[in-house]
Every structure is written in C-alpha cells, then in structure tokens.
Amino acid sequence: MTANRPALPTRDKAVSDLSATEASDEHAALSQEIASHDARYYQEDAPVISDADYDRLRRRYEDIEARFPALKNDDSLSRKVGAAPSAKFAKVVHQVPMLSLQNAFSDEEVEEFVARVRRFLNLAESAELAFTAEPKIDGLSCSLRYEGGVLVRAATRGDGTQGEDVTANVRTIAEIPHRLTGAGVPDIIDIRGEVYMGKADFLALNARQEEAGKPVFANPRNAAAGSLRQLDPEITRSRPLRFFAYAWGQAEPGPPGASQHEVVDAFRRFGLPTNPLTIRVTDAAGLLAHYRKIGAERASLGYDIDGVVYKVDSLALQERLGFVSRSPRWAIAHKFAAEQATTVIEAIEIQVGRTGALTPVAKLTPVTVGGVVVSNATLHNEDYIRAIGGNGEEIREGIDIRVGDTVVVQRAGDVIPQVVSVVLDKRPAGATAYQFPHHCPVCNSQAVREVDPKTGKQDAVRRCTGGLICPAQAVERLRHFVSRNAFDIEGLGEKQAHAFYEWKLIAEPADIFRLQARNEQSLSKLENREGWGRTSAQNLFAAIEARRTIALDRFIFALGIRHVGETNAKRLARHYGSVEALRDAAIGAEMPTEMEEASEETPPTRRRKPQGNEVWQEMTDIDGIGAVVAEAVVEFFREPHNRQVVEELLKEVTPQPLEAVASTSPVSGKTVVFTGSLERMTRDEAKAMAERLGAKVAGSVSGKTDLLVAGPGAGSKLEKARSLGVKTITEDEWFDLVG
C-alpha cells in the first residue's frame, strides 16, 4: 500500500451511526483510496486489493453518499468508471460509454433489484419480466469495433469514456474473429466483452516465467491484463488469451435482436465466443437458483469468475430504465463472498495522512487471501485495537490486538484487509498490550482525540496537531497541487513533489514558482542531483513558467479544499469570478451553526439569522454547492495559514476567469418539477430524462423553479406555481419541448 494514505477510522461503525463530520472525513478518504486502486487496476494491472474488497469499498462509499446526499456531486467516484487511459497507448473515444455495474451481495439485494425494476416500470406482479443470468468473468473489459463486419479497432474500457487502443494486440487473440460471418451483421457494431486467461494456461505461463527468471503473475486477471496491454503485439501473441462477448455499444442501424439473449445468440452466429452458462429466467428465484448452480461449479470451471450478472432481457425495457451515475438500472452483478486467512502480526506501524489522522497498520507474515498476497491490514484506530467499537461497545469478545498475535484476516471491503478476530490460544506468553502513540511519529507534535462539542463524544481517530509543519501533511498537499487535474506541471508529478520537499527545495505551492530562482542561487544545483540533468531541469523550469497563468477552476481545485473537486471548483469559479471574491465570501459568511453562539445580551445588530447571513445563503444557493461544501470552503479560508498560502501563490500565478458555458438542450440548467399523474412515463423515468438533458429536478415548487410539468390531478404544486408565475406545461408539451 502507499504510505501516508488517509485513514478510515470509522470503518467499524455502521453508516447509519456516522455523524456528518465522520461521514465527510471518511468519504474524502475513500475517494482518494478508490481512485488509487482504480489506477492500479486499470492502468498498472497490479491491484493490491481483491475484487470483493474493492466492491465493498465502493459499496461503503455509495452508502455514505446515500445517507448524506450533500456529499454527492459530479466529481463523486460513484459517477465515474475505471481510470484514465495510460499514456503508453493511443486513446480511443467510446461512442457509447463503457459503464460498470452496481453490485449485490445477498439474496435480499437481488430480490430488491427485481422489485426496484418493477416499481420503476410500474409493472404489476403478474406481468412477466424476463432476465438473463451469466457468469461474471474476471478479466479485462474490451470493446471490439466492427465496420462492414471487419474488425477495425479494439480498445480497453479505460475511464469508461475513452480507453486505450489495443487493436494490434487483440488481432493476435485466436478466438476473436477478424471478420464477422453470417446474416444480420450490423453495418457498425462495438462488441463488448472480457479478455481473460484460463486457469491451466495461467499456471503454464507462470511456470515459463519462473523458468526464464521473469516475474510471475499474481492471478489470471493480472496476467490477462498485462498480456493485452503490451507495447509489443508479439508478446501478446505468445500469451494464451481468450474472449467472451456479452454486450455491445454503438450498433448501426441497430442491435441484431430485440432482447439481450437474442443479441448474444446473434454474436454466436457471427463467430464470436459467448458463455454457454448464460440462461434466461423470469423471476428472482430463477436468478438465485442459477447463482447457486454456478457457485457450486465455480471451482471446476476453466476460468475465474467473481459473480453472476443479471440483466433485464427486453431491450425496450432497458431503454426505459436507462442509467444512474456510473451504471445501468437494468443490470446488477451478484458477487461471491470474500475470503479469510490466518496469519501473524509481526509489527504495528503508524501512518499519517493528509488530514493528520494516525492510522495503525498491522504488518503481517505474508498470506494469500482471495488470490492476492496480503502483508498489511488496517487496524482502523486505537479503540479498534483495544476491542472497542464505534459506539463504545465491546467487539471481538473484548480481545485486544497485540504484536505477535495470530489473527484472522479478511478481504471484505476495507482499503487494505482488516483483522476480524484474534486466535487467543496462540498468543505468545510475552505479548503486551499495544500502547498507541500520543505524539505524531513524523513531526512529534501532540496527537489528540478531539471531542465533539455538541455530543461530547470523543473522536475515534487521533490526529496530529502539527498541521502543515508536519511533513506528512505538507507533502500530501503538494502532491495534490501538482496532480493531473490541478496544475499538472509536466515533469513535476507527485513523486518529484515529494522528493523536492525532502530536499527542502519546496515547502508550499508558491515555492514551485520560485524554484528556478532558488536553484540559480544554490550551490547544490537541481541538474546535478540524481535523476536530473541540465536539459530535464530547464524543461521543468519552462513547464513551471507556462503554468503562471491557469484557469480559475483548476487553481481552486489545486488548493485541496475538502469536498471541492473539479466540478465544484468550476461552480465556484463561475459564480465568484476570482479567488479574491471567493475568499472574501468565505470570510464574510456566517454559518447557521454559529447562530447559537449569540446570547440574549448580544446586540440585535450583531445577532445572526438562523439560516445564516446573506453571504452564506448565496454560497449555499449555488447550484450543486450545498451546506457541506460551503462549510468546507469557509473553514479553509478562515484558517490564517491557508490564506497566507493562497496570498503567496497569487503573487506568482494569475488565475483566469472561466467563459460561460452554452446550454445544449432547452431545459439545460433549468430547475424542473413534475406533479400529477404522468401517463407516458413513470415519475422516475421523467426525472431520469430531465437530468440526462441537463436539468435539475426538484421535489417542490419555489421561486427558483423554472418549469412545472403537470399531469392530471395536479394540486397544490400547480397552484403555487401559478401564484409565483412559474411556467407550467403538460406532459405532451414536455415531450414537444425536449424532442
């Protein structure tokens, strides 16, 4: 694992028990960890967590967003897929995005999926609703583009929008036809499927690798991904890769069938390999029966699978159901359970994250869990070590965790595997209780557990009070500042930022733009350091100079304000127009939580409004910027050191205001309310359609409402809209408007 990653101190707490602050902290930490794992999985083909671990990590993230909707925005990972394509390959834009699937881990979740589909479509229980069920292959997603029946391009999924061009490599896979055969082949079709490696072929490949003194692969998925993403197609040709087709993207003039199973049958007729274990069923019981059947056969299959995928069979119903965030409403992946293993804790180390959180990590005797070698496990926080849960309750039957203990490790949703129990009868005689440090192991500042003034409850995590004088926190801020979506200075990535900090060349963002001047005055020139030369140093200085002018939204994003991702940075940039205006608004804002501070003796002129002052209301009224984001912005600029960092940076950099964005649909950017009985679509379908067109759907009418779509039986909302002068149209007029 990467050192100094943010902790997840509340992981042992149910999401329903998290406070808003705890949820915000964990959401931010999860966002960083998931993005890191996406890069390892999709770009490096070297995941450090199992699929079950990753899936449950995603589930935790999405559950937090479901309970705290203000945390969800356009930058949320729940709206994203995969990771950006590698720079090693040419990029290919997917005409139809390659999305991922929502996951289910229990029978109840599958039954709820079926019920949810019925509710969305307003189908009676007696109405037939067919599904397909197929094994979920553990490989690398790939899109094959055929034009006139001829394979013209192949691409990985990448970030779902664009992937890597692997055409030359895919042409070496024997199972993938260069030309489709048979009747009914569409003029253009993007075949979606999975490139994988069979178990026997994987073992044989690893034997050859070991014999040749080359690194072996951890599992068949890594072997398949690494083999497909080779720069030399001849290496790919030498690897026994295979392929299953199961979906499609663009299809002109249309897909070769009216249902999922008809289209997949057509794939088989065209000469594409399809999975023989795919079936069609008509209820949840049929789905679960097939899941158990495949689970029983899993060990005997010649390839790895990690679950079963269920899809609504009718393409017409799929179209009605549409998509939500990063996945379709009409499909779900029913995943197999995670695995456990027993090992020994050799040491407990403390890592310090960007927010100062001290995270205990168990260093383990390496053990294989779920096909991945595990040597680290999270211990969450000091209470978890002491067998105390998030609400003060006893966990693990009151057995604490000590160095030397034999423990059961599980890969089931944590950032790194977690210790779930201690084998007490194997505890060494000399093992002593672990003493959690009260000082930061990096900067030696005091580490404290804060107390919530409202609840009086002590925070689960102990934090370093050193702030930016703590190298661990300062380095993380610098690494974020130079990241791809921030200043993105060529030649100055996260690794170089860390090194420059260690060499005392930079301590805060503004120092980057003073680097050349300092280098000229220094006796120890950058070009003389290991890994650098005169040309590379000059190229870096030129790249830094080119970033002295930067878009305002990138500048705001680079500051690393909690909850302010790329999209929220754009929203703030468009609204305020300058860093100074944003800073002044943050300083002048009076938050609702501060209203309680005024006593009866407080002069009326100084008392604050219960809903916050006008500056606060203006910020929270920005489309997409709620109270959680606004509070983070206010707290950032109220911290004197942060203001100083920004002021110094503004001496070196000139942020440029954003240009206005043109609307792309008649309702783009407008607030729409639906009321009454809709006859041509369900309420969920109406909301999904409006959001796809760029509108914001509200549940009530207010002065901010731009349009009310009223069906038969519209009542109080229609009356209020008329009183406010809100434009009102019928359902038919809505379809005329949006086409």
Curated annotation (Swiss-Prot):
The gene is ligA. GO terms for molecular function: DNA ligase (NAD+) activity; metal ion binding. GO terms for cellular component: cytosol. Zn(2+) binds at C440, C443, C464, C470. Signal peptide: none annotated. It holds the Pfam family DNA_ligase_ZBD. The keyword Isomerase does not apply. It catalyses: NAD(+) + (deoxyribonucleotide)n-3'-hydroxyl + 5'-phospho-(deoxyribonucleotide)m = (deoxyribonucleotide)n+m + AMP + beta-nicotinamide D-nucleotide. InterPro entries: BRCT_dom, BRCT_dom_sf, DisA/LigA_HHH, DNA_ligase, DNA_ligase_AS, DNA_ligase_CS, DNAligase_adenylation, DNAligase_N. GO terms for biological process: DNA repair; DNA replication. NAD(+) binds at D51, A52, D53, Y54, D55, S100, L101, E134, R157, E194, K311, K335. The active site is at K136 (n6-amp-lysine intermediate). DNA ligase that catalyzes the formation of phosphodiester linkages between 5'-phosphoryl and 3'-hydroxyl groups in double-stranded DNA using NAD as a coenzyme and as the energy source for the reaction. It is essential for DNA replication and repair of damaged DNA. NCBIfam families: dnlj, PRK07956.1. Keywords: DNA damage, DNA repair, DNA replication, Ligase, Magnesium, Manganese, Metal-binding, NAD, Zinc. Its cofactor is Mg(2+); Mn(2+). Its EC number is 6.5.1.2. HAMAP family: DNA_ligase_A (MF_01588). Residues 662-739 form the BRCT domain. The lineage of its organism: Bacteria, Pseudomonadati, Pseudomonadota, Alphaproteobacteria, Hyphomicrobiales. This is DNA ligase.
